[in-house]
């Protein structure tokens, strides 16, 4: 081992996934699943987190792990924060998608196209979009993500103001 090894936090992940032969990963949500491994040789026994996490959560997680306590801008959240409602957001083919630990909503910017209990309905065939209220927490969170992202990009404001 090199001297620097003990002072290094290793981040191992994929930038995308390929088509899986496992049917579990062939639905509109789980087809985006990739491994994210944060390895610190000085931390105790590793643990597996079975919670929604996405690539934009890597930076806040790394900053949390190294004890960074200054302001920073991120649409992601540290996986160390257990007090937040963790979600993942994707956009593909004109459809926004947000999921928490059990539900996924699909939204075209105007209306909900799909709502599925992906943990129990892994093929995502039972769509209950018509029963989702307009003030649904996940929908509001998705709309906030979209608004924050678009505002930040248009106004070049994806920074933390002091």
Task: State the predicted function of each range.
Residues 1-162:
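Solvent-exposed soluble domains appended to multi-pass membrane proteins
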């Amino acid at each position: 081992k090199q001297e620097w090894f003990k002072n290094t936090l290793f981040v191992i992940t994929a930038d995308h996934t390929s088509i899986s032969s496992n049917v579990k990963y062939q639905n509109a949500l789980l087809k985006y699943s990739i491994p994210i491994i944060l390895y610190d040789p000085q931390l105790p026994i590793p643990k597996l987190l079975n919670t929604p996490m996405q690539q934009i959560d890597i930076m806040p997680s790394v900053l949390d792990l190294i004890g960074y306590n200054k302001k920073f801008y991120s649409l992601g959240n540290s996986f160390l924060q257990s007090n937040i409602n963790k979600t993942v957001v994707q956009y593909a083919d004109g459809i926004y998608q947000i999921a928490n630990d059990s539900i996924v909503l699909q939204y075209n910017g105007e209306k909900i196209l799909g709502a599925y209990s992906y943990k129990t309905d892994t093929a995502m065939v039972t769509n209950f979009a018509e029963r989702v209220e307009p003030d649904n927490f996940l929908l509001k969170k998705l709309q906030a993500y979209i608004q924050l992202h678009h505002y930040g990009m248009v106004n070049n404001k994806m920074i933390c103001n002091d």
